[in-house]
Structure formats: C-alpha cells, structure tokens
Design a protein with these regions (language model features):
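N-terminal cap/lid segment of alpha/beta-hydrolase-fold proteins
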Residues: 3-47
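C-terminal catalytic histidine-bearing segment of alpha/beta-hydrolase fold enzymes
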Residues: 215-249
C-alpha cells in the first residue's frame, strides 16, 4: 500500500536559512504525494556532506517537536529533516485513517527523495527516528524503503491497531487498521540496524507487544528499557544521539 509515483515532481521550496549557535535552520516544503509537506532542514554551520536523520513525531507532534533533537545532532555533525505529520491522524473512521497513515509513510519516502536535492546531504548515510505514532511509521518505512542505514524506534509496539482500536472503542477499527501494523513490515527491512527504546512506566506500550516488534526485526538490533514514561527521558535521548553518531560515522 506504500508505493508511489517516483516521477511526480517534488516541488521543493527552501525558505531563508537562519544560523544560531553553530546550527543552521531552513524551512522547506515539498510535494509529499498526498499534498504539500512542511518542515525544517537543520544542519551544522559550515560545509558538508553530512549524514541525515529523518524524524517522525508522535500523534500530536509537528515539525517543531523534534527540533531539540535536531539541534543536539547538529552539534555532532549530523543534519536532520523534521516534518509535520498529516493532519487529523485518528478520526475513528477506519478507511479514512488508513489512507492518512499510508500518506504519512509515503510522505516519508518522498522525504528520502528530497534529500537528493538538499545541499550537502549525504544520501548514503541516512537514518530515521520515530516516536510513538511516528515509531510505527518509521518501522513501516524501514520495511518498504531500503535506503535507511538505521532506525531508532521510540515508544513503539508491534500493533499500533491495539491502542487506536481502544481509543476508538471499536473492534472493527482495530481489525481494519491491523492491515498496516508495524510488525507486518519491519521484518522486510534490508540493511537496516535498529535501536528500540521504551519506558517501563509507559501504559501505552506493554512489554509483550514491544518485544514482539523487536523479535520481528531481522537485522542487527538493540533493545533498551528506561525507568521512564511514554515520553522517555534524557538518558534515552543521550543514548539515541550517541547510537546515531556511531551508526552514521
């Protein structure tokens, strides 16, 4: 379901860049395949090429949510692309929400295409970070698009359909959304190394379903638990930064 027309123009537009504290931030927009997508291209001051991390936030996140992560990575010599998710991810209308989810993943595939047009982006050293809802999207992305060297799956689980079905109070919704559960796609990832990060005090991600996602990943992988809630903590962020720096060195 995550295929797309690679010939469709990206219509990339770059705004004015601003530099602060050795970090350059530039707004951008492009055709994500199902409408325009806005976000930020963040990179170290100076010349590249830089490895790149593609971010996907949680269900209530925006292109700004993971800018603190992008700033920390810039200090390590890594560029980042942070992007808005689609609007209204969960309406409790199963077919509409499935279309939105597919558009989210396709938009991230188009974002990987955009990297080839961004100045000083090293398209051979690319990783992705997904948090919560974005973790499911990132797991699917790794399974269907094999341009990722690695991916950090934060507060993810095997079956996104479970919390969504509970939220919508609908077994039918859960069955329908189960068609795109991340556990069905992460096993198809090729050449991708994974870091799974979860909090022991996270009520949304039970350990059994987290472990099921980790088991499904076939390549090199590492799983870390934290004494933290769904949002994780500073230690998890430090670990992710260091892991990405090693992976993309």
């Amino acid at each position: 379901p995550f295929s797309y027309d690679k010939r469709r123009p990206l219509a990339l537009r770059l705004g004015a860049a601003r530099t602060q504290g050795g970090v350059v931030r530039q707004p951008l927009s492009f055709d994500a395949g199902h409408g325009s997508k806005a976000g930020f291209w963040t990179h170290p001051d100076g010349s590249g090429p830089w490895p790149v991390v593609l971010f996907s936030p949680g269900s209530d996140g925006t292109a700004r949510s993971q800018l603190p992560d992008a700033d920390r990575l810039a200090a390590r010599g890594i560029a980042s692309l942070t992007l808005d998710p689609p609007a209204r991810l969960t309406t409790c209308h199963a077919q509409a929400d499935l279309r939105t989810y597919v558009a989210y993943v396709v938009g991230r595939r188009r974002a990987l295409d955009v990297l080839g047009k961004l100045p000083d982006a090293d398209t051979h050293r690319v990783a992705a970070v997904g948090f919560s809802f974005g973790a499911a999207v990132t797991a699917a992305l790794a399974g269907v698009d094999h341009r990722l060297r690695g991916a950090v799956i934060q507060s993810g689980r095997a079956h996104l359909s479970a919390p969504l079905g509970a939220y919508c109070r609908s077994a039918a919704y859960r069955r329908a959304f189960g068609a795109v559960d991340p556990v069905k796609y992460i096993s198809r990832a090729a050449g991708t190394t994974f870091l799974f990060q979860n909090g022991r005090a996270d009520p949304i991600s039970p350990q059994a379903d987290v472990d099921a996602l980790v088991r499904a990943a076939k390549g090199p992988k590492e799983q870390r638990w934290y004494d933290a809630p769904h949002e994780l903590d500073a230690q998890a962020r430090d670990d992710s930064d260091a892991w990405l720096a090693r992976l993309l060195a």
